[in-house]
Amino acid sequence: MQHTLRRSLPMLAFALAVAIGWHFGFISTESVSMVGMLGITMNTAGARVIDPILSTVAQGYQNAEFIGMNLFPYVPVGQRGGKIITFGKEDFALYNTARAPGADTKRIQYGFSGSPYALESHSLEGLVPFEFLQEAAAVPGIDMARGGIMKVQNIIALRLEYAQATLATTAANYPAGNKTTLVGTAQWSDFSGTSDPISDIEVAKEAIRAKIGKRPNTVAVGAAVWAKLRQHPKIVDRIKYTGRDSATPELVASLFGVKRMLIGDAIYDNNGTFADVWGKYCVIGYTELGTLAELGVPSFGYTYRLNGYPLVEQPYEDRNAKSWIYPVTDEVSPVIAGNTAGYLISAAVA
């Protein structure tokens, strides 16, 4: 009886999802349209029945060690490819706005150019053996399905974090005046008195302000950089008057004159050896979620993600593996929208 019930419940849930989708027009003979719920349109060949509850788990997942979304804010898009909207320098131009009686009013046009973007599809399936489900059912508060989804989403999110870090720490992505490489005693790991992280950050802030008219609001560093930065004599000397024994991200952010000081603690397996995702870099940037209603703001980067993603497809039973399978799919792509809104310090520490 229990075996039959265990097998029947997911099928009943599947049938119910299909019935609800058909009733509300989400599922039809020709296509599966989830626009009303998730903003997704799929043809028959690529049709998926979505588990809305588990998709909510995947979409709400956040790893506190990941900082990429702070430099590349999430922007929902309705297509897997399109143009990145960028705006010109019209806001900073000086116009002759004087008008004589009866004369025509001068006009300006906000021009924009678009760089292409294409979302990447990433999928992974979480496997939960029947035995685990049976044992977890006897312990209140354990949700193996949710745990399986979060494990898969953590892997997908780590890949995205790595992609964001790679974009942000590649010197070729920045214009000539928006990057520098520290060497020798100029590196922040040198405490002999030559290195000066506060001065270096000020140079970066001014380089950004001179090009976009706004001061950066975010500084992001790798874990190795933070380990030295928080102990740097010039940092320690500045914070000693605050009554604090050690530098915190909040204190250093205030010292640098930015809203956010981000520490990239994420690591990844690099051929059997763990390595920091954010390396020995420092990224300074202005990052805000611009909208067309605001006529755009010169943000450093965005993370374009298809509406309603990541999503969890209807779980299915693998009799050979004696497990339930939870497929998770993401359609996402981080992009640098305005490289003049960022500044890269390479080799910040030795």
Pin down the residues of each PLM region.
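Sequence/fold signature of self-assembling virion shell proteins
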Residues: 32-98, 117-120, 183-192, 236-350
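A structural signal for short, well-ordered beta-strand segments and their strand-loop junctions
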Residues: 218-222, 262-263
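Alpha-helical scaffold segments that mediate packing/assembly in large oligomeric complexes
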Residues: 130-215, 223-237, 349-350
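N-terminal, non-cleaved signal-anchor transmembrane helix
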Residues: 1-32
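Short, surface-exposed beta-edge/turn micro-motifs
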Residues: 215-218, 280-281
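Short acidic, glycine/tyrosine-flanked loop/strand segments centered on an H-E-D-like triad
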Residues: 112-137
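Polar, enzyme-active/binding microenvironments
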Residues: 17, 34-37, 160, 164
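Hydrophobic, aromatic-lined core segments that form the binding pocket/scaffold
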Residues: 84, 103-107
